[in-house]
Amino acid sequence: MKNGGGKSMQVKDRLIYKEIKFQAAPFSYDLKFFARITLVRGYSATGKTYLYNLFSDLRLTKEFNKIVLFNYKTDNFVSELRKVKNSFVVIDNGDILIDDKIKAHINFDKSNQYLLFLRNCDGLNLSQDSFTVLHKSDNHITIEKEFKL
């Protein structure tokens, strides 16, 4: 996997990463974020969990060491999530893990940026910029806004 760069912003701007670019052959990824909470929605088998797995390698680099991952295999999910500060939190299988208490935590936790692989967004404070889908064009993967005005 080859890093192409990550543009970080200060926490006061509420985005830990504004952009994450990298290559994982045969694909190149250019992921741009416009909101503190980003939902990646879509049907099964569209690459969401694959992207989550790529983040597990990417977070080992100096450039992307603020990435923290959670999924259904995470022990003590609730207590571990509450400990995380100033990070880019990625949660896979959010429909299984995220209940109303976690949604409230995410809403009021201004120190972290969240990337959620989640279908049910009821209870989250979101903007239209929060709703995204993975988009593939040739071997280039991006996150596109779901609602374009």
What positions do the PLM features span?
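N-terminal pre-Walker A segment at the start of P-loop NTPase domains
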Residues: 2-29
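Phosphate-binding P-loop
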Residues: 30-35
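Hydrophobic anchor at the beta1->P-loop junction of P-loop NTPases
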Residues: 40-42
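Conserved glycine(s) of the Walker
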Residues: 46-48
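Post-Walker A alpha-helix
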Residues: 51-52
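Post-Walker A helix-loop "phosphate-sensing" segment adjacent to the P-loop in P-loop NTPases
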Residues: 57-67
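Conserved nucleotide-sensing/catalytic segment adjacent to the nucleotide-binding pocket
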Residues: 73-123
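A short helix-turn-beta junction within AAA+ P-loop NTPase domains corresponding to the substrate/partner-engaging
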Residues: 126-149
